[in-house]
């Protein structure tokens, strides 16, 4: 939780089976807003994998689960967690570069992503002029395995993130269900 105060991008890294994905998922359920889990694919090469793209043939924007989560976060007060599961299966700088740049902007008013060059009549309400605002209540949590099937996370990414190492498997335990906690940012 303290890492969320330091950065909008948390990276949970370590060996398989340490709960890197289930930790943010469980935490977000506790906050009354289940996380969106995006499974990063080795084929991710650019921003369209996360943000979608405008199809010139159909004249429609093909949105992604990631983009829907960003959009919905603009309607919520609760913290929104978007989990990039196994984020280093592809080069992070390729598909997440624009988001890294946006989150570095000093003013939250500048946290805006250009999705399409011109606005269309059917654009969602929170998409203004083909752009979408990244809510201050949004955090990105990347999970990363350290093995031969993954890419090394570069200093460019580490400089903008709060890395947390999880290298030991914990013993399973039982606990009583707890009521969710309502938190706003």
Predicted regions and their residues:
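AAA+ P-loop NTPase catalytic core and its hallmark functional loops
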Residues: 1-184
